[in-house]
Structures are given as structure tokens and as C-alpha cells.
A protein has these predicted regions:
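A conserved beta-strand-to-alpha-helix junction within the catalytic ATP-binding
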Residues: 1-13, 24
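Conserved catalytic submotifs in the C-terminal HATPase_c
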Residues: 17-18, 22-31
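Short helix-loop "hinge" at the ATP-lid/N-box region of the Bergerat-fold HATPase_c
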Residues: 51-52
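Short beta-strand/loop element within the Bergerat-fold HATPase_c
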Residues: 58-70
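Acidic ATP/Mg2+-coordinating residue in the GHKL
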Residues: 78
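Short conserved segment of the HATPase_c
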Residues: 83-97
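Conserved glycine-rich
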Residues: 124-125
């Protein structure tokens, strides 16, 4: 799981570099888990890409990985524009766009977070979000170490 996150960040580094956004990976311990690598890579990539996409120049996106005896935890935090309180309950809906005024300058299908959520639920996991407008967003993902599909 550590290598998976390293690969995601390595792949997204050039995109982040265009906006001078620092990608930080904090790994608190080696984590080995039974996962569908393709689906989980897509899910975490979506979160990191959003962190880059909805960020300010010279911002940061921090990805951290931790685990206990039962679950592993991935947190994706950013210094971006944040999500308005009245939108937070809708962000995992398909085609929901938080800010329509930015949609012309920010590419996307509106499916990213819906796909992310379903991939995490498929792993019997959970995803939570905390956000404050103009202060950034933190997505917290919890997935059992042994998921049976």
C-alpha cells in the first residue's frame, strides 16, 4: 500500500508542478493490505487530483498512510479553496459540481468523487470529509486490511 501511494504521487507530480503545488507523503508504518489495486489507485488518485485541481498556486497536498491491527487509513489534505458547507453533503453524488462558475476553467466529469466513494465502499471502507471554505479540505479513508470482494 505504501508503494501504491508513492506511485500515485510520482505520476501526479508533473501536474502539481505546473501550479507549484507541493505533494507530501507521510507514511507512519509499512502497510500490507488485501486490495483491488486498480480501483484503490483510481480512488486515491481522484482525491489527490482534486487536491491539486482545486488548490491555489504554491499550495500543498499531503497524503498520509497509517494502520492499526484492523484497518489502514489514508488521509488526503490540501490547502485549497475548500468546499462550501451547503455542498458538503452532495459532493459524492454523480455529476455534482460544487462551483459551477469554475467549471469552465476546471476540467472534470463530475464523477470523480462518486467513483472514489464506490471503490472505497467496495473495499468495505468508509470515507469522510472535513472542509472549510478558503482553508482547504481533508478526506479521510478507512479500509479493512483484509477485504474479501
Amino acid at each position: 500500500t505504501n508503494e501504491l501511494l508513492e506511485l500515485i504521487l510520482k505520476r501526479l507530480k508533473p501536474i502539481a508542478a505546473k501550479k507549484n503545488i507541493e505533494l507530501i507523503l507521510e507514511s507512519f508504518r509499512p502497510v500490507t493490505a488485501e486490495i483491488d489495486e486498480t480501483k484503490l489507485t483510481l480512488a486515491i488518485s481522484n482525491l489527490v487530483e482534486n487536491g491539486i485541481k482545486y488548490n491555489h498556486k504554491n499550495g500543498w497536498v499531503r497524503v498520509s498512510l497509517n494502520a492499526d491491527h484492523k484497518y489502514f487509513y489514508v488521509t488526503v489534505a490540501d490547502s485549497g479553496m475548500g468546499i462550501p458547507e451547503d455542498s458538503i453533503d452532495h459532493i459524492f453524488e454523480r455529476f455534482y459540481r460544487v462551483d459551477k462558475s469554475h467549471s469552465s476553467e476546471i476540467d472534470g466529469t463530475g464523477l470523480g468523487l462518486a467513483i472514489t466513494r464506490s471503490a472505497i465502499l467496495m473495499h468495505r471502507g468508509a470515507i469522510r470529509v472535513r472542509s472549510k471554505e478558503n482553508e482547504g479540505t481533508t478526506f479521510s479513508v478507512r479500509i479493512p486490511l483484509t477485504y474479501i470482494g
